[in-house]
C-alpha cells in the first residue's frame, strides 16, 4: 500500500481536476497506455519480473547483463498495405514518448494524434552504445542512424516463433503475430485544473507513479 503522503496529490486531483480525452493502444487486444513492443526491452521486462530484488539498480543490472548475449530477430511489419522486413534489436510502439524515467524511445509521440509512433532499433555495435544511451535520455534517439521510425494507426508484427512482448513494462507471452493498434480518443483522464493545455505527459506521470510502486 503506498504511503498517504504519496496519494495526497492524487486525491486533490480527483476533486478539482478537469476531464480530458486522449488515445490509448492495444497489443493483441491487451490495453496499453504509454509503450509496448517486442525484442530486447520485452526480454528485459521478463527477466526483471523474475528477479528476487526490485528497484532501478536491478533493472539496470538486468539490462547490462542481457544486452551482452541478446541476439536480434528478423520481423515482418505490415502497415498501410505494405510489408517490410527488419532485423531488429527491438521494436517499440509509442502512444506516449517515453518508457519512463525520462528514457524517450519515441520522442515525437503525443497522446492525442491518433497515431502510433514506431521505433525500430537495428543491430548495433558496442561503439554505438554511448551515443544511443545519450540520445535516449536527450530526446534525440530518432536522429541516430541505427534507428528507423514511422507512424501508423495499426501494425502487425510477424516473427518466426512465439515470444515475450511488453506493455507498459509488463511482460506477456504471445504468438508469432502481434497486432498493435491505436484507440483514438478512447480514454478519459483527469488533469490538473491549473495545468496548461498539454496532455503529452499526463500518462507518463501516471506511469512513473506505477513504476515506483512496482519497485517497492
Q: What is each of the regions a protein language model found here?
A:
Residues 41-44, 85-87, 99-102, 126-129:
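Short acidic/glycine-rich loop or secondary-structure boundary segments that cap or lie
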Residues 37, 41, 92-107, 171:
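Glycine-rich phosphate/pyrophosphate-binding beta-alpha loops
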Residues 11-89:
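Catalytic core of DAGKc-family lipid kinases
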Residues 50-58, 107-128:
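Gly/Ser/Thr-rich active-site loops/lids in small-molecule metabolic enzymes
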Residues 7, 32-35, 83-93, 166-169, ...:
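Short amphipathic beta-strand/extended segments with alternating polar/hydrophobic composition
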Residues 79, 85, 110, 120-216:
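ATP/nucleoside-binding phosphotransfer catalytic cores, i.e., glycine-rich phosphate-binding loops
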Residues 1-13:
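Short, small-residue-biased leader/transition segments that mark boundaries at the very start
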Residues 25, 44, 91, 118, ...:
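A residue-level signal for conserved active-site and pocket-lining positions in enzyme catalytic cores
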Amino acid at each position: 500500500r503506498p504511503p498517504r503522503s504519496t496519494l495526497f496529490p492524487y486525491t486533490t486531483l480527483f476533486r478539482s481536476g478537469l476531464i480530458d480525452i486522449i488515445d490509448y493502444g492495444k497489443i493483441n487486444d491487451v490495453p496499453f497506455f504509454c509503450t509496448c513492443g517486442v525484442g530486447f526491452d520485452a526480454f528485459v521486462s521478463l527477466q526483471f519480473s523474475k528477479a528476487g530484488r526490485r528497484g532501478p539498480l536491478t533493472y539496470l543490472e538486468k539490462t547490462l547483463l542481457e544486452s551482452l548475449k541478446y541476439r536480434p530477430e528478423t520481423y515482418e511489419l505490415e502497415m498501410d498495405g505494405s510489408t517490410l522486413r527488419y532485423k531488429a534489436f527491438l521494436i517499440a510502439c509509442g502512444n506516449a514518448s517515453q518508457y519512463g524515467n525520462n528514457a524517450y524511445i519515441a520522442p515525437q509521440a503525443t497522446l492525442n494524434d491518433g497515431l502510433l509512433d514506431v521505433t525500430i532499433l537495428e543491430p548495433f555495435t558496442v561503439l554505438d552504445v554511448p551515443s544511443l544511451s545519450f540520445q535516449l535520455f536527450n530526446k534525440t534517439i530518432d536522429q541516430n542512424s541505427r534507428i528507423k521510425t514511422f507512424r501508423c494507426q495499426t501494425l502487425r508484427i510477424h516473427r518466426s516463433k512465439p515470444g515475450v512482448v511488453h506493455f507498459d513494462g509488463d511482460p506477456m507471452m504471445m504468438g508469432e503475430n502481434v497486432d498493435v493498434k491505436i484507440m483514438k480518443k478512447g480514454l478519459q483522464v483527469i488533469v490538473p485544473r491549473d495545468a496548461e493545455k498539454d496532455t503529452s505527459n499526463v500518462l507518463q506521470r501516471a506511469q512513473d507513479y506505477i513504476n515506483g510502486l512496482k519497485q517497492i
